[in-house]
Amino acid sequence: MAETFLFTSESVNEGHPDKLCDQISDAVLDACLAQDPDSKVACETCTKTNMVMVFGEITTKADVDYEKIVRDTCRNIGFTSADVGLDADNCKVLVNIEQQSSDIAQGVHGHFSKRPEEIGAGDQGHMFGYATDETPELMPLSHVLATKLGARLTEVRKNGTCAWLRPDGKTQVTVEYYNENGAMVPIRVHTVLISTQHDETVTNDEIAADLKEHVIKPVIPEKYLDEKTIFHLNPSGRFVIGGPHGDAGLTGRKIIIDTYGGWGAHGGGAFSGKDPTKVDRSGAYIVRQAAKSIVASGLARRCIVQVSYAIGVPEPLSVFVDTYGTGKIPDKEILQIVKESFDFRPGMISINLDLKRGGNSRFLKTAAYGHFGRDDPDFTWEVVKPLKWDNKVQA
């Protein structure tokens, strides 16, 4: 057998303090966009024992009750008493929100006077999109499995299957891969790690048995598990104190979990709490669509796309494509197809991906269990765009 290697991705649940903050920031964004699609939002959240603070810059015509959004979001996750890590109805909620800087406003959207194609990037930066043919979602398997384990933990907590579960939790999956001329081929799951918050009533043996039966079995396809697969289930031995009581939380601290689980690359910009003029978010969404479309159209088995911006400038400074040697045609030709097929100007990304539409918990949904590889019509950047190319070269 050819040489293999191990690669690991992690995820965290919606009750993890950093993810709680991401969800609050995006719930605020949803509320602003629902009433005023031109809202300019940069909303950060932090939390620690018995306290949540939202702060940042928001310019909107929307009438938003920030405190209610904070409490509702915490409650929906399951933070309903100090015992589980936070009491949504009795915790302190601090709000420190100002208008967007007038310097930024004039440079980016001319105080709302610019046409969509003229709107400049809200900041400088570079973003990456990635896709791989190893899963139906065109996402890395290690990341998909870690993410789905986290989502399943929440599901069995909320539906009562595992009543001992509490909201906070982390997952991690190590996959053994084979490199097939640049494409990634998963062979087996090497290690599964789950650390989940629990109540006082349950033993470690019960935790391990329940996690195997109700979380791991429904999520990880049998073909990837064998007698050598290693399981670390609550290896610390005790995880009763969790949520913001256990650790402080901040928006934007789980950017690898939000994207590709360590695969591809990351420009460093977080997503949650940002309206689509912030290219950290909209730029990353359009390059995911580009990379996914390249793989889905058969141009390559694996692909990364980079885009970069300057503040106030609509046109991207650079676009880059690398297919890791899996391209059916040269990368420079694929790059040309990408440039002809996708409009990377922030105002046009907003229109083409319908990113000004809030409500329906649209962005709140992105803030837990990943922004990519999700089968949901609100995730417009996951729609494959047919790319025109002459695939006779395959023969």
UniProtKB/Swiss-Prot annotation:
Binding residues for Mg(2+): 10
Catalytic activity: L-methionine + ATP + H2O = S-adenosyl-L-methionine + phosphate + diphosphate
Keyword Metal-binding tagged: yes
A GO cellular component annotation in the UniProt record: cytosol
The protein's name: S-adenosylmethionine synthase 5
SUPFAM superfamilies named in the record: S-adenosylmethionine synthetase (SSF55973)
UniProt-annotated location(s): Cytoplasm
Gene designation: METK5
Keywords: ATP-binding, Cobalt, Cytoplasm, Magnesium, Metal-binding, Nucleotide-binding, One-carbon metabolism, Potassium, Transferase
Family membership noted in the UniProt record: Belongs to the AdoMet synthase family.
EC numbers for this chain: 2.5.1.6
NCBIfam families in the record: metK
Keyword Nucleotide-binding applies: yes
InterPro entries linked: ADOMET_SYNTHASE_CS (IPR022631), S-AdoMet_synt_C (IPR022630), S-AdoMet_synt_central (IPR022629), S-AdoMet_synt_N (IPR022628), S-AdoMet_synthetase (IPR002133), S-AdoMet_synthetase_sfam (IPR022636)
Co-factor note (free text): Binds 2 divalent ions per subunit. The metal ions interact primarily with the substrate. Can utilize magnesium, manganese or cobalt (in vitro). Binds 1 potassium ion per subunit. The potassium ion interacts primarily with the substrate.
Pathway assignment: Amino-acid biosynthesis; S-adenosyl-L-methionine biosynthesis; S-adenosyl-L-methionine from L-methionine: step 1/1
Residues involved in L-methionine binding: 57, 100, 247, 278
Positions bound to K(+): 44
Protein role: Catalyzes the formation of S-adenosylmethionine from methionine and ATP. The reaction comprises two steps that are both catalyzed by the same enzyme: formation of S-adenosylmethionine (AdoMet) and triphosphate, and subsequent hydrolysis of the triphosphate.
Enzyme type, top EC level: transferase
Chain residues that bind ATP: 16, 168-170, 236-239, 247, 253-254, 270, 274, 278
Major location (coarse): cytoplasm
GO BP field: one-carbon metabolic process; S-adenosylmethionine biosynthetic process
Quaternary context: Homotetramer.
GO molecular function, one term: methionine adenosyltransferase activity
CC cofactor: Mn(2+); Mg(2+); Co(2+); K(+)
